[in-house]
UniProtKB/Swiss-Prot annotation:
Cofactors that this protein relies on: Mg(2+); Mn(2+)
GO molecular function annotation: ATP binding; D-alanine-D-alanine ligase activity; metal ion binding
Full protein name: D-alanine--D-alanine ligase
Keyword Cytoplasm: yes
Residues binding Mg(2+) 1: 303, 316
Keyword annotations from UniProtKB, A to Z: ATP-binding, Cell shape, Cell wall biogenesis/degradation, Cytoplasm, Ligase, Magnesium, Manganese, Metal-binding, Nucleotide-binding, Peptidoglycan synthesis
Length: 377
């Protein structure tokens, strides 16, 4: 039986480039463990160029990346308008894309648009699901209008930010807030703010990453929860995981980039989270509701905050969850009796299923007949 060819894409130009490599290693091993697929790897360098498969294999093996990229760039025809994606031709045809590009390109819908243009199946949400979910402000608007509980927030740009003094923020949202770049992931461009000086610095930092910034209320006594969701029309939800960070060190009591990807030794993980049956049911239902409202497919991780009264608030979705050894998403499915190999096999099947379903849709056009207009008369 001929094995289907899976194009595993990793790297990218975001701050999560190195995280993507570690996720891709685990996905590669899981796909290989199924024994069902041939894997072709493509790294996207930090300059945005797809690298050929041989160079990509070296980068996946964590060889020193820059010399590999430099050598590849010497082979690039700079006059080719498609030079950035030209390397995709180097491996011949393949059956499905498996993107593992965190942050920009992978989670904002860019790659999914390319896959759709190439008329190829791919793992994960469609372009619009990624694009909407990557924009924290737009996500919160959709959650709110659909009755899915989330925290109070304000959205500002560089001009309107001048209208929101620290005193005004405190009156509206309380004296502890989080300032976040609207279009970034994994705690990049996020600051916990407790005074006017920190507020000014946080805005300046977040505006380095996006021209739209979210200012969000803090949740009193918050426990951070995570839930995995996989599937298409009838998605499955994992057990709920919880993590707590001591109020010390770089994290200041919240789950920041360092705690997620650099050193999680101080983080306490709890799988499954010790919650009442009522709260467990509510969190899982909110996760499923958000998955559908945001038009997600394939996979996602839903992050929640649980306040001191055990009321859950949906924080934000992650449409391409990390799959490193430190990632809770990976561990949640392990606990739910879906091991890595089974999980990736299901994700690939969901990708083929969604592609086949979309092929049934009609994209007909209306002819304008022989009428000629403008300069073409």
């Amino acid at each position: 039986m001929t094995k289907k060819r899976v194009a595993l894409i990793f790297g990218g130009n975001s701050s999560e480039h190195d995280v993507s490599k570690r996720s891709a290693q685990n996905f590669y091993n899981a796909i290989e463990a199924t024994g069902k697929y041939e894997i072709i790897v493509f790294a996207i360098a930090q300059n945005g160029f797809f690298l050929d498969t041989e160079s990509s294999k070296k980068i996946l093996a964590l060889e020193d990346e820059q010399p590999i990229v430099d050598a590849f760039m010497k082979t690039v025809d700079a006059s080719d308008p498609l030079a950035r994606i030209h390397a995709l031709k180097s491996a011949g045809d393949f059956d499905i894309f498996f993107p593992v590009v965190h942050g920009n390109l992978g989670e904002d819908g860019t790659l999914q648009g390319l896959f759709k243009l190439l008329d190829k199946p791919y793992v994960g949400a469609p372009l619009r699901g990624h694009a909407v979910s990557f924009d924290k402000a737009l996500t919160k608007e959709l959650l709110t209008v659909n009755g899915i509980r989330n925290t109070k927030y304000i959205v500002v740009d560089p001009e309107s930010a001048n209208n929101w003094s620290w005193d005004k923020i405190v009156a509206e949202l309380g004296n502890i807030v989080f300032v976040k770049a609207a279009n970034q992931g994994s705690s990049v461009g996020i600051s916990r703010v407790t005074n006017a000086e920190e507020y000014t610095e946080a805005l300046s930092d977040s505006f380095q990453y996006d021209y739209k910034v979210l200012i969000e209320e803090a949740v009193n006594g918050a426990r951070e929860l995570e839930v995995g969701v996989i599937g298409n029309d009838q998605p499955l939800v994992s057990e709920i995981g919880a993590h707590t960070v001591p109020n010390q060190g770089s994290g200041d009591g919240w789950y920041d980039y360092n705690n997620k990807f650099v050193d999680n030794s101080a983080v306490h993980f709890e799988i499954p989270a010790q919650l009442s049956p009522e709260v467990t049911k509510e969190v899982k239902q909110m996760a499923l509701d958000a998955y559908k409202v945001l038009n997600l497919r394939g996979e996602a991780r839903m992050d929640f905050l649980l306040d001191e009264n055990n009321v859950p608030y949906l924080g934000e979705p992650n449409t391409l969850p990390g799959f490193t050894n430190m990632s809770l998403f990976k561990r949640l499915w392990d606990y739910s009796d879906i091991n890595n190999a089974k999980l990736v096999d299901m994700l690939i099947d969901y990708g083929f299923e969604d592609f086949a379903q979309n092929k049934k849709l009609s994209y007909s056009f209306v002819s304008l007949g022989e009428e000629k207009i403008g300069k073409f008369n």
